[in-house]
């Protein structure tokens, strides 16, 4: 039986962490990886392992495929950690889609149901806004309050607002494409370090997703939920909830409200976390963690070498 550590937290990545070939090395060493993908595929209705290993990338990057594939990947890494007797974290959190991975690992929802749910989430998000109508942009080196004020100033009746508070000085905005362009033009004129439109087809975490969130809530209501066995810090309010109804409402709101990632990480730290493992493919969150709180010891654990290093250091 592995021990519980109050100083250990796990975080789970969102869209953008996917890559063709992800977890191939881990799957070669641990049969549970492929089994986890196959289990998720039953819920999603897509051969997630084939898609993850062979692509093509443009199919893997379709949000209705990306979401269940990343969910499967993160849960697979978690299960490997469990099989190896890794120390149990006292807190979990996930970035956007990663919140669903965290809830599965905390026992709130089965992997099968979660895979079906996030595939539907992807379809609802994709169909919520016609192609070309929405956009997202990353802004590096700006002040959060100033950027929010510019969004309000240039909206002109359209939707544009902060979508991801990823780290200090690292913000993503989302909304109508024309309004996003106006914000970028204004910020560039104000001397913001970097402002780049993202190659995404869906303007996530803004008011354009409210109808999709309503329909997502209807789908959630058909599924079996449990109270998590490990606290999950949720994005919408950077806090944990202790009833199924509150958890589901927070998941709905997450679709049209910003991901408060900086605050989520600070809540983990305030709750006693000094070590944080990134549970899934890639190292996107590890980079953000270092920008948010340099005192946190971080490890990605998506490869055998990374797992060995984390277990050796954190045994």
Task: For the regions a language model picked out, list residue spans one by one.
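FabD-like malonyl-/acyl-CoA
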Residues: 2-147, 194, 198, 275-308
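Alpha/beta catalytic cores of group-transfer enzymes, especially the acyltransferase/condensing modules
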Residues: 15-17, 42-44, 106-257
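A short, flexible low-complexity segment enriched in Lys/Arg and Gly/Pro that occurs
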Residues: 69-76, 253-261
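Non-catalytic positions within long, well-ordered alpha-helices that form the structural scaffold/packing
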Residues: 82, 188, 269-272
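NAD(P)-dependent dehydrogenase/reductase Rossmann-like domain
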Residues: 179-180, 272, 304-305, 309-315
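Generic hydrophobic alpha-helical scaffold/packing signal
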Residues: 233, 252, 265-269, 286, ...
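A short, acidic, amphipathic alpha-helical segment used as a generic capping/interface helix at domain edges
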Residues: 256-273
């Amino acid at each position: 039986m592995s021990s519980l550590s109050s100083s250990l937290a796990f975080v789970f990545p969102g869209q953008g962490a996917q890559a063709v070939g992800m977890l191939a090395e881990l799957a070669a060493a641990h049969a549970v990886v492929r089994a986890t993908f196959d289990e998720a595929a039953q819920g999603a209705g897509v051969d997630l392992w084939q898609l993850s290993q062979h692509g093509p990338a443009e199919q893997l990057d379709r949000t209705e495929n990306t979401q269940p594939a990343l969910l499967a990947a993160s849960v697979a890494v978690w299960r490997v950690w469990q099989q190896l007797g890794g120390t149990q974290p006292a807190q979990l959190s996930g970035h956007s889609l990663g919140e669903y991975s965290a809830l599965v690992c905390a026992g709130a929802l089965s992997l099968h149901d979660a895979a079906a749910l996030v595939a539907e989430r992807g379809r609802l998000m994709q169909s919520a806004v016609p192609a070309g109508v929405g956009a997202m942009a990353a802004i590096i080196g700006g002040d959060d309050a100033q950027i929010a004020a510019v969004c309000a100033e240039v909206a002109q009746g359209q939707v544009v607002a902060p979508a991801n508070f990823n780290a200090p000085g690292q913000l993503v905005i989302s909304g109508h494409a024309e309004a996003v362009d106006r914000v970028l033009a204004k910020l560039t004129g104000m001397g913001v370090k970097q402002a780049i439109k993202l190659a995404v087809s869906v303007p996530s975490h803004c008011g354009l997703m409210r109808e999709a969130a309503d329909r997502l809530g209807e789908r959630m209501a058909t599924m079996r939920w449990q109270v998590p066995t490990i606290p999950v810090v949720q994005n919408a309010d950077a806090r944990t909830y202790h009833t199924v109804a509150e958890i589901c409402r927070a998941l709905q709101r997450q679709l049209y409200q910003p991901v408060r990632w900086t605050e989520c990480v600070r809540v983990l730290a305030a709750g006693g976390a000094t070590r944080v493992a990134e549970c899934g493919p890639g190292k996107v969150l590890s980079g953000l963690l270092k920008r948010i709180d340099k005192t946190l010891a971080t490890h990605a654990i998506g490869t055998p070498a990374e797992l060995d290093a984390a277990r050796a250091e954190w045994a």
